[in-house]
């Protein structure tokens, strides 16, 4: 069973039809929408500020979600994939976004809807990724505009697949 821990009088609120892997950790002021999945060794730590996640968010294995005390909460929209080993910290991620494996998104960043942060990228503090952009690198920079094929073939496909994968573990 996942570690779901109340802290300072605030208990995580887990959305309907959400899968929590046995080694996932969810602490404090965390609110999740429905159809989310939190995978093995992922940590969602709402201890120093709040974390709000929309519907159909998948937080893949070993990812870390955190926020900044008295400054930056973490807000994640709907249909978002946070790749394996990613760190997402004190930022805003809108709907239909893919944060690639091993990426770091730092405080006060805004990732608008229908965007991709490529695997291994470092999105430095205060960066604004506009709607429909693909970013990558260290530090991350705009690579190109997203195509409809990339949006459907990656962003939506991965989010939908993780809803399916999580159903396998609930049986």
State the predicted function of each range.
Residues 81:
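Short proline/glycine- and basic residue-enriched helix-capping loop/turn segments at helix->loop/beta transitions
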């Amino acid at each position: 069973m996942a570690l779901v821990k109340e802290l300072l009088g605030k208990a995580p609120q887990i959305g309907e039809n959400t899968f929590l892997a046995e080694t996932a950790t969810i602490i404090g002021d965390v609110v999740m929408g429905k159809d989310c999945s939190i995978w093995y060794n992922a940590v969602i730590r709402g201890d120093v500020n709040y974390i709000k996640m929309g519907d159909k968010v998948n937080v893949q294995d070993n990812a870390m979600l955190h926020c900044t005390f008295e400054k930056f909460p973490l807000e994640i929209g709907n249909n978002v994939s946070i790749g394996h080993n990613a760190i997402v910290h004190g930022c805003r991620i809108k709907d239909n976004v893919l944060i690639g494996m091993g990426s770091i998104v730092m405080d006060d960043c805004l990732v608008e809807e229908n965007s991709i942060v490529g695997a291994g990228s470092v999105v430095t503090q205060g960066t604004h990724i506009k709607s429909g952009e693909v970013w990558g690198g260290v530090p991350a920079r705009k690579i190109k505009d997203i195509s409809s094929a990339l949006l459907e073939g990656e962003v939506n496909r991965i989010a939908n697949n993780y809803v399916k994968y999580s159903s396998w573990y609930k049986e």
